[in-house]
Amino acid sequence: MLLLFSCTKEVTIDIPGYEEQIVIDGRIETGQPPIILISKSKEVYSSTDLNSFLSGFVSGAVVTISDGTTTIQLDEICSDNLPPGTEALAAAILGIPVSELANYNICAYTTLNASFIGTVGKTYQLSVSFNGKTYTASTSILTPTPLNNPILRISAGRS
């Protein structure tokens, strides 16, 4: 004798309202200039396509960074209007082929000042002003911890 049971019940979930927010994605690494991308958040349940993704990037912000001694305003550099010689670097950062950079208008905030690069032991303060609001953050580049005794062992019979 085989018995099968099943139930169906419609469940309605009340999803809270969506409020667009600013997303700030920044990094500074040892020996590299700071790079900041600013975009608008997207609703989780909205449809997504390339155009809606690309339209979410923000331009027109005022972005400053300080290392405790020097404060600079970062330059807005957009993919459709890059300074000569920077195309390969921008393509690598954005993950877009160099041949397609001009087709997109993605703006990043950085500096072409070679004296302002990430340094081990420094703490950096970021300030972003956009649409009448100011957002702040800080980060530090910590001293790297060296590996004491790296060993690679290959088990017999494994390739």
Q: Locations of the language-model features?
A:
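A sequence/structural signal for flexible, mid-protein segments enriched
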Residues: 8-159
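C-terminal motif of bacterial Sec signal peptides marking the signal peptidase cleavage site
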Residues: 3-6
